[in-house]
C-alpha cells in the first residue's frame, strides 16, 4: 500500500502541547521586562482616553495570601482589558506602610524600650523588606504595572502630601479636638478606627444592680403616690461591671411605661414590660403598685451603690426592651450614647469621670479598685455590690463583642482627648461632610449594586472620625496648641506647609526632632507641640490626593481622579470609606467613579480559610505546580461578587479547562502552517459558506466578550471562550474542516478559505484570553503568522472579523439548523458504535428522512452534506419514505438510518467510497483524492 502522507497538509506547529507554565512563565516575565512593555504602553497611550484603576494598598507585612492574589489578578484583568479596548490604563501599585502591626513586629524583635527615632528607623527598614517580597510575588502573578516606581505611604513625598491633605481639611474647618469615647485597645495603647474593629464571641458577667433613691418624694410623686413606705431602688442591667465605678447617670426612654414594684423589703423601678422576667431572674415575688412614663422620672436623683455621689435620670431614645430592665446605667467615659446623653444634659468634659488608664488599669486613686486591670476587677465589683445590698442578680452570657483585629483582644469605648474629622461640623463653605459623602454615594456606580446601600448606611450612622493615634510609626499631626487656650496656632495651615517641606526631604522624623522654636520663634514657649500620629486609614484614604495628583499624576484633571476602586467587601468600612470622606472634605466629591467589591475566599465547602482547618491554598504553591495562568483562570471563572471557593480540586478543574483552551489554540496554530496572511488571506466573498459562518460567530462572540469585560463579568468571558472552544469549534467547525484542510490542494481556495477563518479566529481568540491568560496569550502571539507588534498587549481588540449578511442563503439561522441536525446524527452514530454496528464515523452511511422544508434546506449543501456530517455518504429522502427501522431524532421532522458502508476505505482520506480501487495507478484511493493529488483539485462551495 502506497504511503500518501506526503500528499496531505498535515498540521504542524512548534507551539508546545504541554504548557509547562511554572517553567515557561518566568521567561515571559523577562521578555516583558526586556522590551519595557509597561513603558511602551504609556508611550502609545498619550492620545488614548484614560482609564485609572487606583490600587488599594496592601499592608507591607507578611507574605501574600490567596485573597491578595484574587485582588491583584482582578485588577490586572481590568487594566489589560481596558488597554486592549483602546484606553491608556496605567496601573501604579502601592503599599500601606505605617501603623501598629509593623511597630509591633519591630518591638517583638528588638524590644519595647527602643528610642522612638530608632523604632521609626527599624519600622521603615522592615516595611521596605516586606514590600520587596510581596512585589516579587505580585509580579510573578503576571500583574502589569509600574513596579519600578510604586507608591508607598512611607515615601517622604507621600508623607509630606498627606500632611498637605490634612492641611486642606484644617483649612476648611473639618478638624477639631474633642473628648469622646473611641474604640480603645489596651494592647495597641491607642484608639482604633471603625475598620479596625471586628466582632467575636466573649463570655461576660451580667448583673442587675439597684441604685437607691435619693429623691424619694419626687419618685413617689412621679408614680402618683403621696409617699413611699419602704426603700426604693431603680434597677439597671449591664454586661460590664467594671463600668459601675464610673457611673454618672441612669437612662430611661421617655415613652416606655415604668412600674413601681413592691418586692417585699423594697420597691423596684423596672420597665413594666420586663417586670415578670426580672422578678424571675431575682427569684422574688412582686406586685406592680403604680406605673409612669419614663419622662416622669427625668432628673430624679438616685445614689451610686458604693460611692457618695448622685446618679440622675436622663431621657434617652436608645433605651430598648430587648433585654435587661429597661433602664441603662450611664458611664459617659465608656459609652458613646451615654457620652452624648450626658453632654446633652450639660455635663462638661471636666465633669466626666474616666478612671481607666490607657493600659486598662484603674487609676490608683480609685477607691476599692485602684490599680486593678478592669477585666480582673469585674468579680471584685460584683462582690462590692453584693456587700452593699445592691446586687439583685449575677449570671454569665456568651455574646458578640468588639475585638481588636490585630490582637484579637476585647476593646472598650474610652473617652480620651483626640483629633476628629467632624461629620456634621459646618465647614467654612458648603455642606457638612456627612451630607457631601451621602450625596457622593448617589453619584457613584457600585458593582455589585448592593454596595451602595451598605456604604450609605455606614456613612449615615457613623460618628465623627477619630484620626489621631498615640503611636511612633505614623505620619504626624503637626499641630501646635496654645497652652492656655487649647486653640490651634493661628498660622496652623501655613506652618503645616513648612513642616511638609521638611518631611519631603527628611521623612516624618523631621517633625519629631523639630524644635518648636525653629518655626514659632519666641512664641514657642506658649505652645505645646503635638506628637500624635494619623490613623493609617487617613494614610491610605488620601492616596487619591497625594499619589494620583502628586507623585504619579495619572488621575483625571477634574472630578473623581480614579475611574475605579476595587477591593474586598470589608473595604466599605475601610479604604472605600476613608477615601470617600477625604475626597468629599478636600474636593467635595468622591475620588472614584465606580466601586467594585469582591468576596472572600473559602474552601469548596464554604468554610473560611484557616491553617487549623488545613484548607488554605498558598498562591506561591499553585504557581510553582500549576502556573500563574491557572490561578488567573480560576479567578476569572468565579463570580467574585460572593464568596470565592478555592481548593486543589477546583484548581484542577481550572487546569482541565485551560488544557481545552490551549489545545484549541494549538489546533488553530498547527493548521495555519504555511499560511501567510499577506498573500493567502481571502476576502469574505471568496470564502466558503461554513468558514464565513465561523468568522461571523467569532464576531458575535467578540461583541459579547467586549461587553462582559466592560461590565467586569469575567466569569462570562471565561464561559463564552471555553464554550466556543468546546462546542462551536471543537464540537462542530474544527471537526468538519479537517478533511478539507488536510486533503485538498495546499493552495486551493478550499484550504485557504479555511485557513483565513482560522487566522481570523486565532487573532481574535488570543486577544480575548490576553487579560486572563496573560502568559499563554503572549506565547500564542509569537506563533501567529504575519507581522505584528512585539506583544499582544500592544494590540487592541481584533477588527478583522466580518459579519455574515442576513440575506445570504446559508445565513446564521441556517447553520443553527445544520448544527442541530449534525448533533442528532452524532447521537445516532454513537449508538451504532456502542452496538458495534459501525466503527468510526467514516465507516457509516447515513440516510436522513426529512420533512419537505428541512429536506430543501439540507439539500442546499448538495454533495457536501456528508463532509458536514463527517460520514462517507449522506443521503436525503422524504420523511414519508422512512422505513420502520429508521430512528426518530430530536429534530422535528427528521428520522435517521445509519448503516455500515460496504465500500472500500480510501487510504488517503479514509472515506468509504464506491470508486476506491477503480484506478489502476492508485488502487487505494478514491476519485476525489486522485483529483486532489494529480488533477486541478476538487472544488468546494459550502463546507
From Swiss-Prot:
It is an enzyme of class 6 (ligase). The gene is ileS. Coiled coil: none annotated. Catalyzes the attachment of isoleucine to tRNA(Ile). As IleRS can inadvertently accommodate and process structurally similar amino acids such as valine, to avoid such errors it has two additional distinct tRNA(Ile)-dependent editing activities. One activity is designated as 'pretransfer' editing and involves the hydrolysis of activated Val-AMP. The other activity is designated 'posttransfer' editing and involves deacylation of mischarged Val-tRNA(Ile). One of its GO terms (molecular function) is zinc ion binding. Binds 1 zinc ion per subunit. ATP binds at residue 611. It is found in: Cytoplasm. Its EC number is 6.1.1.5. A motif ('HIGH' region) lies at residues 58-68. NCBIfam families: ileS (TIGR00392). Belongs to the class-I aminoacyl-tRNA synthetase family. IleS type 1 subfamily. Its cofactor is Zn(2+). This is Isoleucine--tRNA ligase. Monomer. IleRS has two distinct active sites: one for aminoacylation and one for editing. The misactivated valine is translocated from the active site to the editing site, which sterically excludes the correctly activated isoleucine. The single editing site contains two valyl binding pockets, one specific for each substrate (Val-AMP or Val-tRNA(Ile)). Transmembrane segments: none annotated.
